[in-house]
Structures are given as C-alpha cells and as structure tokens.
C-alpha cells in the first residue's frame, strides 16, 4: 500500500487536463503508440467533438520512480465545466491528492478556484501545475505568483509542463510519488469499499468503480450493499488500465472495478458502501451530498411509438449519470414524455444528444425552467418547476425564485460590458476586487432563471471569450412571476408555456411569436399567434393566408362578379378557420428554445 498514489486532475475548462492525462499514460507505457489516440480517456463521441470531459475516468498507471521502486498511480481525469462539478466532488473522495492545472496564458480562472475549494474540503494534498508553457503568450512567472498569492499554495511545489509536447511530464510523475501521501487502510479488516461511479455494460451488467478503504475482495465473494442490504456474488474484480484488466483480488487503498451481474440501476448509487456478507463492517462510509438539479425541462419522443424506448434509454442513462432525474409527464400537444431535472443547460444538451445518438430516439424538449416556491393564500407552500402546475393566480400570496452568487473573472477592460449584462439580468449586490493587476473578480447575485437561458454565451460574447464564470445557489427571494401562454389559432399550446418575470414577459412573448411565425407553414387561412398572461394578450403576430386567385377567369366585365367570388372565398376561409387544426412542426418547438440575441 505504501507504493500506491490515488490522485485527480482538476482545472478550469480547456486548461489541458485530458491532454496531460494522455501524456502520463504514454509516459507510463500503459498503451502502445499504435493504439494511442488523443483524449484517450474521453470515451463518448460527444466529449471528443466538443473537446470537453463530461464523465470522470479512472486509469491505473505503473511507474518506476527515480528511487528505482515500482509505484501504482491511480489517475482520475475530471470535468472542468461548472455543470459537472458533482463528478469532480465524487472523484475527489477516492483520492488523497490532486494536480491543479493552470493555463500559463490564461492564469487562475473561476472554475480553478471552485475545484480547488472542493479539493480542500476533502483535505487533499495539492500539487499546482502550470501547463501550456510552450505557448508564445505564456507567462509562467506571473501565473506562479497568482498561484502563490491568490490560492495560497506552496510555490516550491509548482511544476511547469507542456502537455502538448510532453515537456515536464516525467517531473510531475516524480512529484506525485514524492509529495502525495499513500492511502491509509487495513487489508485485514472487514471490507469497506466506496462506490464513486458506475457504468452500464449491455453484456456484463453494471460495472461499479470502487475505492477500497479497508479489507479485500475477490471473485466468488458475496458482497452486501449497506443501505439496501441487497447481496450479490462477485464475478470479477480488476483495475482500469485504459481497458479493464481482471485481477485475483483488490486490496485496501486500491481503486478498481467490481462485476457482480447487477442488473438494476438503482442499487449502485454512488456514495454507497459495499461490505462482505461473511464478515461485514460495523459502519457505512460517509456518502455524498445528494446533487441538486437546477434546470427542468420536459422530454417527449417525436414519434409516440418511441415512448417505451425512451423509458429504457433514460433508465440506462441514469446509471451513468447520477445527477439526472426524471418523472412521467404528459402534454396535450406532444403526448407522453418525462419531466427531467438537470444541473445546467450544458448537462441538458449532453443528455439530449446522448439519447438521440446512443439510443437513436428523436426528441423534442420544452422551454427549460427552474424550481419556484409559491406561498398560497391558505398558508401552504408549493414547489413548481413545470408551467402546467402553475397555481391559480388568485390563490397566490407570494412567489420566490432561486438566486445564485456568480463569480465572474474578466480582464479589466470588459468591466462595463459585464456590469451591463448583469444589470440586464436583474443582478443585485455587485462587488468586485482585483486578484491580480489587470484582472477583476466580479461578484454578483443573479436570478437563476436569467442565467440558464443564455447568460454564459452572452458573457463569452461581451468579453470576447476571456470571461470565466462559476456560481453557487444561495437562497430563494421574492419575485413577480407570471405564466406566459402561447396561443396558436386561439388554442393554448401547453408545451410552449413559460414561467417568466413580469418585466421580461412581453419581450419573451414577442420572441416566441416571431420564432413560431418563421417555423409554422402557411395555411389556407390566417393564423394568429399570441402570447398571453391570463386573459391579457401581451404580444401577437399573424401568419398570412395562402391565397388562390379566384378572379383570374374574370375578363373585365362587372366588378360585382369579382366581388361575389371574393366574398365566397372569404366565407370558405372563415369556415375553414373554425374547423382547421394547425399542425405545429417540431422545429417550431426547438426555435422557441433559442434565446433572443
């Protein structure tokens, strides 16, 4: 156990975590040059295409240090995006140390701080690494000063490297062996293993990733899940060496996987403790905080025959994505579907894309919303995240909406533009300070509903890509909320209803009407598209009718003949309008999701 090191790589988005992990794997000779590919640990196509890490991945690296001893380094590559910070917190519980990567050109950014605080909460030893020193714009001395002064980390531990070229990677591996502590635990004690992740394999069932705190486990053992008491027979144990590699036993201090023919998704909840039936441990390990969903949207299959497939797909996705929640939902316009909870808009996009790609289901999503708290006139409170469940306005005493504390790191020259953006989004209690010369940390309290829409894109736009953003939920505050209904041909479309602040209702209504006008095909009769709050129409647009030239066969002659034909056409269109249904194409629902620029 003295020769084991368990560590994570944490950083802001695009600071080079996955690239450094690739170089470490190459340096340790785990994979041949022929089998190597970039972003080796990012298994999903969507991760490779977007250049982001969504799912934490584990790999076991054998390494011979400069003292000549063989060490086992268990590396966990983590995501950098704020939506997936729960993946980071789960990965950190299985480690004793972390590499904190900072870009030599960008310096310390918002997510760098957030992930550092997560590591400190877990009492991890931290080795700062300044990456991308090969860039022409790199300023390693300046960034080293930032790390020492802003983060309070030891400057003597700072490692310089270029993950792209491989410079400095060997020194980082030596530093891990030298400065990170070995795991503590007793291999002879009763088994205590913490599940920190799980993946679904269609042939082998659930693959659980575990960190053994005490004891040993081998194939043939009967394991017990401590919270549920369910028991399974272990089929295989092993380590992650890019691919799974079976072993006879796993011992205290090691990070590996267990296969036990587990078919049900719910049993393998991350944070669960596993022990042996024959020699159980006395107490379960401290688990994880339940992750809080902040964005809610309804998902429906475009083809209603795909509903059963969607049920299966969500169940399987839930195993790989502990933060996803869903419950059954139905809509007059779209049929049966699910109301899902997500960690943010990127998480929502990723789930949608994975369902469409991996399970080949075409989907439609409703407008995202957050969870509001209503106090009703009879004194009861009601949590609402779906516009369909909006209480009767005459019974509402008070509405509260979630607020976040946003930390925005920007170059000084963009201060005015960012302040305007925050004020547009109903920002409050703005403060700022200078972490380093020329850079400002702008702290602002914002309604979450204003952030989930397109705040991150707008921030990147006004700061020309230099702004970074992190947030945490703080509390619920009183708000003036209304339900915005969209009516097509005087019929409300429930799937397009939105909960919005009264100040933004007209703007959002106009945007939705204009988007629908572009997407709904013209009919033989005029279609009115309206946005209404209760009985008051706040925005309206019309789709003009297609017109057949009924007077084409009239050559001159009496005007009354033309008028008679036009009146006859008008009466026919009026009759058509009263009985005609307007089919709203799927693209129209997606268009309403697009935020106003």
Curated annotation (Swiss-Prot):
Enzyme class: hydrolase
GO molecular function: GTP binding; GTPase activity; ribosome binding; translation elongation factor activity
Binding site for GTP: 14-19, 131-134
Membrane topology note: Peripheral membrane protein
Cited InterPro entries: EF-4, EFG_III/V, EFG_V-like, EFTu-like_2, G_TR_CS, LepA_C_sf, LepA_CTD, LepA_IV
UniProt main location, coarse: membrane
One Pfam family hit: GTP_EFTU
Cell compartment(s), UniProt: Cell inner membrane
The keyword Disulfide bond is annotated on this UniProt entry: no
Swiss-Prot/TrEMBL keywords: Cell inner membrane, Cell membrane, GTP-binding, Hydrolase, Membrane, Nucleotide-binding, Protein biosynthesis
Catalyzed reactions: GTP + H2O = GDP + phosphate + H(+)
Gene Ontology annotations of biological process type: positive regulation of translation
PROSITE patterns: G_TR_1, G_TR_2
Its job: Required for accurate and efficient protein synthesis under certain stress conditions. May act as a fidelity factor of the translation reaction, by catalyzing a one-codon backward translocation of tRNAs on improperly translocated ribosomes. Back-translocation proceeds from a post-translocation (POST) complex to a pre-translocation (PRE) complex, thus giving elongation factor G a second chance to translocate the tRNAs correctly. Binds to ribosomes in a GTP-dependent manner.
PANTHER family for the chain: TRANSLATION FACTOR GUF1 HOMOLOG, CHLOROPLASTIC, TRANSLATION FACTOR GUF1-RELATED
Family, similarity comment: Belongs to the TRAFAC class translation factor GTPase superfamily. Classic translation factor GTPase family. LepA subfamily.
UniProt name for this protein: Elongation factor 4
Native organism: Desulfotalea psychrophila (strain LSv54 / DSM 12343)
Lineage: Bacteria, Pseudomonadati, Thermodesulfobacteriota, Desulfobulbia, Desulfobulbales
């Amino acid at each position: 156990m003295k020769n084991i090191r368990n560590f994570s790589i944490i950083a802001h988005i695009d600071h080079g975590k996955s690239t450094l992990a690739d170089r470490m794997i190459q340096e340790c000779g785990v994979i041949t040059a022929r089998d190597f590919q970039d972003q080796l640990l990012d298994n999903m196509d969507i991760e490779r295409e977007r250049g982001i890490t969504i799912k934490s991945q584990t790999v076991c690296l054998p390494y011979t240090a400069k003292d000549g001893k063989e060490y086992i380094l268990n590396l966990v590559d983590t995501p950098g995006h704020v939506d997936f910070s729960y993946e980071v917190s789960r990965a950190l519980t299985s480690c004793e140390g972390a590499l904190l990567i900072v870009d030599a050109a960008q310096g310390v950014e918002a997510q760098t701080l957030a992930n550092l605080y997560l590591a400190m909460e877990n009492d991890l030893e931290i080795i700062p690494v300044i990456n991308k020193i090969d860039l022409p714009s790199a300023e390693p001395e300046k960034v080293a000063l930032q790390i020492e002064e802003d983060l309070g980390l030891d400057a003597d531990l700072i490692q310089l490297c270029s993950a792209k070229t491989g410079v400095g990677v060997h020194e980082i591996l030596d530093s891990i062996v030298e400065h990170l502590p070995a795991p503590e635990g007793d291999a002879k004690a009763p088994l205590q293993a913490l599940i920190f992740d799980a993946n679904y394999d269609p042939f082998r069932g659930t693959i659980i990733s575990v960190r053994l705190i005490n004891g040993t486990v081998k194939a043939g053992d009967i394991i017990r899940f401590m919270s549920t008491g369910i028991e399974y027979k272990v089929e295989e144990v092993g380590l992650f060496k890019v691919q799974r590699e079976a072993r006879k036993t796993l011992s205290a201090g090691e990070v590996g996987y267990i296969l036990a023919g587990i078919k049900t998704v719910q049993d393998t909840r991350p944070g669960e403790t596993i022990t042996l039936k024959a020699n159980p441990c006395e107490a379960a390990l401290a688990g994880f905080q339940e992750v809080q969903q902040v964005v809610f949207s309804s998902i429906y299959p475009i083809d209603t025959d795909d509903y059963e497939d969607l049920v299966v797909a969500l169940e399987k996705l839930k195993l790989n994505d502990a933060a996803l929640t869903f419950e059954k939902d139905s809509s007059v316009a779209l049929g049966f579907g699910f109301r899902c909870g997500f960690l943010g808009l990127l998480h929502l996009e990723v789930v949608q894309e994975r369902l469409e790609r991996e399970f080949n289901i075409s989907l439609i999503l409703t407008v995202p919303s957050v969870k509001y708290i209503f106090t009703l006139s009879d004194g009861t409170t009601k949590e609402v995240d779906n516009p369909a469940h909006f209480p009767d306005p005459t019974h509402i005493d008070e509405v509260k909406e979630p607020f976040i504390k946003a930390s925005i790191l920007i170059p000084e020259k963009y201060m005015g533009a960012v302040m305007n953006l925050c004020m547009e989004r109903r920002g409050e209690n703005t403060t700022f300070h200078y972490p380093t010369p020329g850079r400002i940390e702008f702290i602002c309290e914002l309604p979450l509903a204003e952030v989930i829409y397109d705040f991150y894109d707008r921030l990147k736009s006004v700061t020309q890509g230099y702004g970074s953003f992190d947030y945490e939920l703080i509390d619920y505050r009183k708000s003036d909320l209304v339900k915005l209904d969209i009516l097509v041909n005087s019929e409300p479309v429930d799937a397009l209803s939105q909960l919005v602040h009264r100040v933004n209702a007209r703007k959002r209504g106009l945007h939705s009407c204009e988007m629908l006008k572009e997407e709904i095909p013209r009919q033989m009769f005029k279609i009115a598209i309206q946005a209404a709050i209760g009985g008051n129409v706040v925005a309206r647009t019309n789709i003009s009718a297609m017109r057949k030239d009924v007077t084409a066969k009239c050559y001159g002659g009496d005007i009354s003949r033309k008028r008679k034909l036009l009146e006859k056409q008008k009466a026919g269109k009026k009759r058509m309008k009263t009985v005609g249904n307007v089919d709203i194409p799927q693209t129209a629902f997606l268009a309403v999701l697009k935020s106003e620029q």
